[in-house]
Amino acid sequence: MFKGVLFDLDGVITDTAEFHYRAWKKLGDEIGIPLDRSFNEQLKGVSREDSLTLLLAHGKKEEQFSKTEFLELAKRKNDYYLEMIQSITPKDVFPGILELLKDLRANNIKIALASASKNGPFLLAKMGLESYFDAIADPAKVANGKPAPDIFLLAAKEIGLTPRDCIGIEDAKAGIAAI
C-alpha cells in the first residue's frame, strides 16, 4: 500500500502549458529563434534554465549569451509567464483533482508537489490547493532536473517517505522518465 503521492503540476493539476508556450515563443521571437509547438514539446516538464539551454541550442545561439545574459533571459521568460498566470483561479484545477486530494487527505496519505516549476507555491495558492500539500519540493534544491529523478526523491524525503512508498503522477515524457 502506498503512503504518499507525488504530483507534478503542469498538465496534472492544471494546464499552464499554453502560458509557458506563449512566454517561450515571445522570448524566442525577441532573440530571433522561432519556436513552434512541436519544439515546445521538448520543454515540457523541464526546468526553466534547461529549457532555455534547449531553446538556444535549437536556434544555434548557445554561445551568444554570457551567463549573466542567460540568467536575464530566463528571468524575462518567467516574468512573461507570471504576468500571464495572474488570471489562474480554482476554476482552472482539472476535474477530479480536488476530490482526489480530499480523498488522499481523508485516508492519511501524504501529498507532495514534485514540479520543475519554481512557481508551484504561487500556482497552488492561486488555485486554493496549498493546504492539501504536506510538502512542496523546491526545484532549486536539486542538482538535476527531469528526466533525472531528483525532484521526486526530494519530494518523498520531504514527506518522510521512501520512494517505494510513493506513487508519482506525471504527464510529460521527462517526468515519466524521472519516476
Model-predicted segments: where are they?
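Hydrophobic alpha-helical core bundles mediating ligand binding, dimerization, or RNAP-core interactions
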Residues: 20, 24, 28, 48-52, ...
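Active-site neighborhood of HAD-like aspartate-dependent phosphohydrolases
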Residues: 1-41
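Substrate-recognition "cap/lid" segment bordering the active-site pocket of phosphatases
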Residues: 90-91, 114, 118-169, 173-177
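Metal-dependent phosphoesterase signature
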Residues: 34, 58-95
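Short, acidic loop-to-helix structural element flanking the phosphoryl-transfer center
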Residues: 83-113
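Helix N-cap/coil-helix junction residues
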Residues: 33-35, 61, 129, 160-161
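Alpha-helical substrate-recognition element adjacent to the catalytic core
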Residues: 27-59, 67
